[in-house]
């Protein structure tokens, strides 16, 4: 989600500032917490959020969703989903959208596009009887992101359903990898991109069209992590829109 659909980390678009930190200091302290304690970086930022909010901000699902309402989206994102789904339907292809993110599920659920996804896989909190977040419920990092691709492939979407480990015949796969398109922006997406690529699907790297910094997508292309790259402009008629429609056309032909 972050820097794929939105130009910045979701936590940095209101929450961090609301608890008295500047963004750079927050992430520096969070990363130091992780490295100094052999701690997952995502668990570290979640703990930092919880501790920083004490005495300054209600740390509830509702407040986190409010922060999500402030998250900016790249051009064209808001109407992308219906447009691409409609194009797919017109060409005999059922299109579904999923989120696999190391960001916060609660914030994503507060965004304008939350209802466009069949399933949101992201880090999230457990809440006590007062509705206050007290413990991580789920943490999604760059390596365990891949499990969700297998869940999507097999149609076993419940995160606690062990059926994802069952053996499926190729013709039983609900969404074969060859029909998947994975869009991401950085190294955290590499395991998923590689998995989709080697199984015949399509991985696309995106970069911020305003900064025009292609460093990460060039690196991913050189290392065969992605098949294509494009500016993160989701507007109709732009490069990404044209590319996705071409992939839908190819899928329909096969």
Question: Which sequence ranges carry the predicted segments?
Answer:
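Mg2+-dependent phosphoryl-transfer enzymes with acidic/Ser/Thr/Gly-rich catalytic loops
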Residues: 175-254
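Amphipathic coiled-coil/heptad-repeat helices and related helical stalk/stem segments
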Residues: 77, 165-166, 189, 213
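Extended low-complexity acidic/polar segments
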Residues: 110-138, 197-204, 208
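Conserved Lys-Pro-Asp/Glu-containing loop-to-beta segment of HAD-superfamily phosphomonoesterases
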Residues: 145-188
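Low-complexity, serine/threonine/proline-enriched polar segments
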Residues: 34, 44-49, 126-161
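Alpha-helical substrate-recognition element adjacent to the catalytic core
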Residues: 1-129, 224-227
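Acidic, low-complexity intrinsically disordered regions
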Residues: 13, 25, 127, 147, ...
């Amino acid at each position: 989600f972050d820097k794929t659909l939105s130009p910045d980390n979701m936590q940095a678009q209101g929450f961090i500032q609301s608890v008295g930190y500047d963004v750079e200091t927050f992430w520096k302290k969070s990363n130091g917490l992780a490295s100094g304690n052999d701690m997952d970086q995502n668990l570290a930022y979640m703990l930092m959020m919880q501790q920083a909010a004490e005495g300054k901000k209600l740390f509830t699902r509702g407040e986190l969703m409010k922060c999500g309402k402030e998250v900016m989206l790249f051009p064209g994102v808001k109407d992308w989903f219906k447009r691409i789904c409609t194009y797919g339907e017109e060409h005999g292809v059922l299109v579904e959208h999923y989120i696999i993110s190391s960001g916060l599920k609660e914030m994503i659920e507060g965004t304008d596009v939350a209802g466009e996804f069949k399933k949101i896989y992201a880090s999230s909190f457990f809440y006590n009887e007062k509705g206050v977040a007290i413990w991580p419920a789920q943490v999604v990092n760059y390596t365990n992101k891949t499990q969700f691709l297998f869940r999507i492939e097999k149609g076993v979407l419940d995160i606690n359903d062990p059926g994802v480990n069952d053996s499926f015949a190729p013709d039983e796969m609900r969404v074969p990898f060859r029909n998947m398109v994975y869009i991401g922006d950085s190294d955290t997406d590499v395991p998923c991109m590689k998995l989709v690529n080697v199984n015949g699907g399509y991985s696309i790297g995106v970069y911020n069209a305003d900064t025009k910094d292609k460093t990460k997508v060039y690196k991913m292309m050189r290392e065969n992590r992605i098949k294509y790259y494009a500016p993160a402009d989701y507007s109709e008629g732009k490069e990404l829109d044209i590319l996705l429609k071409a992939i839908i056309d190819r899928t329909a032909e096969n």
